[in-house]
Amino acid sequence: MKNKPKLEISSDGTKFWYLNGYLHRADGPAVEYPNKDKSWYLNGLLHREDGPAVKYASGDKYWYINGKLHRIDGPACEYKNGDKEWYLNDKKVKEEDVINYNITEREYINFIINQT
């Protein structure tokens, strides 16, 4: 039988899912706060591939991959006030760096696919 994360609920109602001692949940947030803040973790690291890994009820959102701020299809930090910040592998970059990163990645993939 496959190990499933164990749910623990704190006295304030915060829900935590643990697997092997680490915050971990593959099918949803590993931490859910009563105020609707949510955080996604895999093996103890903030991680989510299909959306922000941290969503605050205030509207702020943060994208993480393997514990690092990282997003190649937009800003890694989006704030309620409209401000945005771009990160690649936990390094703050300019928006155009993300655009260039994407072009380079696409070109590389096309090169690999089209090799004979």
Give the residues covered by each predicted segment:
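Glycine/tyrosine- and acidic-biased, solvent-exposed loop/turn segments at the edges of beta-strands
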Residues: 1-116
